[in-house]
Structures are given as structure tokens and as C-alpha cells.
UniProtKB/Swiss-Prot annotation:
Entry's transmembrane regions: 40-60, 93-113, 133-153, 171-191, 223-243
Lipid bilayer topology: Multi-pass membrane protein
InterPro entries, sorted: TMEM164 (IPR026508)
Name of the protein in its database record: Transmembrane protein 164
Keyword terms: Membrane, Transmembrane, Transmembrane helix
Places the protein is found: Membrane
Function: Positive regulator of ferroptosis.
């Protein structure tokens, strides 16, 4: 009985992953890189990731001590405390409901297609087949990845961003991302032969396709995620004036009473 339950669990986890599709996984995908190269890349990237985390934490802890002694801290001047902070708002609750529903539908699709293991992917790579509306959910979820951070940063409070010139929170985030990929995702991918976020072999459309695709992708993602994060902060600064402009634009003129 226990063995049957274990087999059922594994079937739910990755039984629906079809290795016949290029980039999904399988023995050939798992053997794309030699174990020597895979080990070397893992040691180098994990070491750099830990260094990023430790260096950033050192600066963050030092800044925290300075703030405790009355320092100005790293809060940007243009972000101020809002009087409505701490109060529930309709827009925030609606956004929370939309995000929960989207994630719930995504989890349901993963169980229905027996690809639950893909929930471990930072960006859910799905086959977009078998069930209706899965393609739409894919894009809705990724649009929410933009809407939610910008909205929370615009609201301020605990979600106040760091200054554009500071990278003390961007560094540990990048380090944790690579540590997660080269430890948890890679180990699970090798055990299950499922290509989780392309840690076993490159996608067929990968611009860095080749034996060193992970090294090229690591450098590219470091640059792009940090640049992208700063752009999100800029958009959060613009969200307030833009929303006010759109509301004024859509507001109907008051009816004149004689």
C-alpha cells in the first residue's frame, strides 16, 4: 500500500512530463553536460551566489545598525508615509483575490496534467496543451508578476523600494535565485530527469545553446534581473501620477444644473 501511494505521488509529481518533446527532460537531456562540467559550474556559481548574499547581508546589517542610531537609512526621499497605510483598501483586496485565483487555477492545471513538479519553476514553463484556458492563465499570471510589485511599491509602507543607486537588496535576491537553481532545481532535475527551468539542457530556442549555455545565461540573467528590478522601481514612482491622470481623463464631467 505504501509503495502504491509512493508511485501515485511520483505519477502526480511528474508523470505527465513527456520527454519526447525537446527540452522537457529525459536521459538525453540529463546527459547533455558531462558530470565534470556540471560539477565545476555548480561549485563556481554557488560560491559566487553565497558571496553575493554574504556581502549584501553585511551592508544591510551595517545599515540597520546606522538606522538604529538615528541614521537617514536608505529610504528614497520621494517615498513618504501615506495616511491611509495600515488600512484595508478595495483595490488591494481585489488584487489579492485575483492573484490567489490565478495561482489556484495554475495549481489545478498542474495536478490535472500531472506536472506538479513544474510548480518549482520560478517561471512556470508549461506545455500549454490538453486543457482549455491554460494559455490564457499563463499570460495572466505573468502579467500579475508585473502588476503586483508595482502596485505594492506604489502603496509604500513595508514595500518601500531601495534607492536606484543601491544594490544591497538586489545582490542577495540574485544570489538566492542562482543558489536555488544550481542546488534544489538541479538536484531534483537530475533525480527525476525533468528539465526544471532548463537546468539539465537548453531549450531548443535558447540563444546561448551549447555546452556553456548555463554560464552565458547566468551572466545575462544577472544583468537583466538587476536592470529589470530598477525599471520596476521607476514604474512604481510613475504609477501614482499616471493613475491620477487616467482617473481624471476618464472622469465624466459634472452635469450642469440650471
Amino acid at each position: 500500500m505504501s509503495r502504491y501511494s509512493y508511485q501515485s505521488l511520483l505519477d502526480w509529481l511528474y508523470g505527465g512530463v513527456d520527454p519526447s518533446f525537446a527540452g522537457n527532460g529525459g536521459p538525453d537531456c540529463a546527459a547533455f553536460l558531462s558530470w565534470q562540467q556540471r560539477l565545476l559550474e555548480s561549485v563556481v556559481v554557488l560560491t559566487l551566489a553565497l558571496l553575493e548574499i554574504l556581502v549584501a547581508l553585511r551592508h544591510i546589517l551595517r545599515q540597520t545598525k546606522e538606522d538604529g542610531r538615528g541614521g537617514r537609512g536608505c529610504q528614497p526621499e520621494q517615498v513618504t508615509q501615506r495616511p491611509e497605510e495600515g488600512k484595508e483598501s478595495l483595490s488591494k483586496n481585489l488584487l489579492l483575490v485575483a492573484l490567489c485565483l490565478t495561482f489556484g487555477v495554475e495549481v489545478g492545471f498542474k495536478f490535472a496534467t500531472k506536472t506538479v513538479i513544474y510548480l518549482l519553476n520560478p517561471c512556470h514553463l508549461v506545455t500549454m496543451m490538453h486543457l482549455p484556458f491554460e494559455l490564457e492563465i499563463y499570460y495572466i499570471q505573468h502579467v500579475m508578476l508585473y502588476v503586483v510589485p508595482i502596485y505594492l511599491l506604489w502603496k509604500g509602507g513595508a514595500y518601500t523600494p531601495e534607492p536606484l543607486s543601491s544594490f544591497r537588496w538586489a545582490l542577495p535576491s540574485t544570489g538566492l535565485m542562482f543558489f536555488y537553481h544550481f542546488s534544489i532545481l538541479q538536484i531534483l532535475g537530475l533525480v527525476t530527469e525533468v528539465n526544471l527551468n532548463n537546468m539539465l539542457c537548453p531549450a531548443i530556442s535558447d540563444p546561448f545553446y551549447g555546452p556553456w549555455y548555463r554560464i552565458w545565461a547566468s551572466g545575462h540573467q544577472t544583468l537583466m534581473t538587476m536592470t529589470h528590478g530598477k525599471l520596476v522601481i521607476l514604474f512604481s514612482y510613475m504609477a501614482g501620477p499616471l493613475c491620477k491622470y487616467l482617473l481624471d481623463l476618464l472622469r465624466l464631467p459634472a452635469k450642469k444644473i440650471d
